[in-house]
Design a protein with these regions (language model features):
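Short, well-structured active-site flanking segments
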Residues: 99-112, 212-220
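Penicillin-recognizing serine hydrolase domain
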Residues: 16, 34-62, 154-242
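Hydrophobic membrane-insertion alpha-helices, especially the h-region
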Residues: 13-28
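Conserved catalytic neighborhood of penicillin-recognizing serine enzymes
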Residues: 116-152, 233-242
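Active-site helix/loop module of the DD-peptidase/beta-lactamase fold
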Residues: 108-124, 165-178
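Active-site SXXK
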Residues: 70-71, 84-109, 201
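Short pre-catalytic segments that frame enzyme active sites
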Residues: 36-83, 99-103, 115
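N-terminal Lys/Arg-rich, disordered targeting/topogenic segments
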Residues: 1-14
């Protein structure tokens, strides 16, 4: 009788062990299958993406296309060569502003804000929320709106915003990036407003996307009401028209 009980318990234990092995085996098989499938899918996507760029004539002097999920480079051209950033500089000015000050703050436009090339969208003495000026900076590439944000930053924080823009670039190992102006316009001495390589710009954009993605959301509007419900400003990015 005792032997039958022992044999029965042994049989049950063996059965449990076999069941556990089967469950674990199925789990690892499923995991490996999914892992291999995902790897193969990713390789196919990479191959297809690269073929698109290989058959496309990129006219820009420098460019880079990076998959943000794993930093895989799909395409690059002179990606480590520093170049003038022009209005890309505004994006970083705006990012530093929203990282330190509320968009609800009131800003009065000064005479100096409108005394530059590309000004004329806003006028001295007008009052705006920081959010309004941010939208003008991002959507219309307004130099006067960007200047008003930068000036207000300096008056409120007590530091020139360009210093903080450069500090952020340095702290994040964006070695090729350097700013001289908040708008990207050249200095009075003729130096570029900002310089940086496509690779470091891609890194900078990833940081902005992870920290304050609304910056990109705001710049995606084709048009926005600004001076009133019947008056709108149009995005300078013509790709949004398509």
């Amino acid at each position: 009788m005792m032997r039958k009980i022992i044999n029965k318990e042994l049989f049950l234990n063996i059965g449990k062990f076999i069941f556990l092995v089967l469950v674990l085996g199925a789990f690892f098989f499923d995991y490996n299958y999914k892992s291999n499938f995902e790897k193969e899918t990713r390789r196919t996507e990479e191959k297809n993406a690269k073929s698109v760029f290989e058959n496309t004539d990129i006219l820009a002097r420098g460019a880079i296309v990076v998959r943000l999920s794993d930093d895989f480079v799909l395409y690059e051209k002179n990606s480590d060569k520093p170049m003038e950033l022009a209005s890309i500089t505004k994006l970083f000015n705006d990012f530093v502003f929203v990282s330190n000050l509320p968009l609800s703050m009131d800003i009065k436009v000064s005479e100096a804000d409108t005394r530059m090339y590309g000004a004329g969208v806003i006028s001295p003495g007008e009052n705006f929320k920081a959010l309004d000026l941010l939208q003008m900076s991002l959507i219309v590439s307004s130099n006067d709106a960007t200047s008003a944000l930068a000036r207000s930053y300096g008056e409120t924080i007590g530091r020139n915003i360009v210093l903080d823009m450069n500090s952020f670039a340095s702290n994040n190992q964006l070695e090729s990036i350097y700013f001289n102006t908040p708008t990207g316009l050249p200095t009075d001495g003729g130096f570029p407003g900002g310089v940086g390589s496509p690779r470091d710009i891609a890194k900078m954009l990833k940081i902005i996307n992870e920290t304050y993605p609304d910056v990109f959301f705001l710049s995606s509007y084709e048009r926005i009401p600004f001076f009133g419900p019947d008056e709108v400003v149009l995005n300078t990015n013509k790709a949004l028209d398509k």
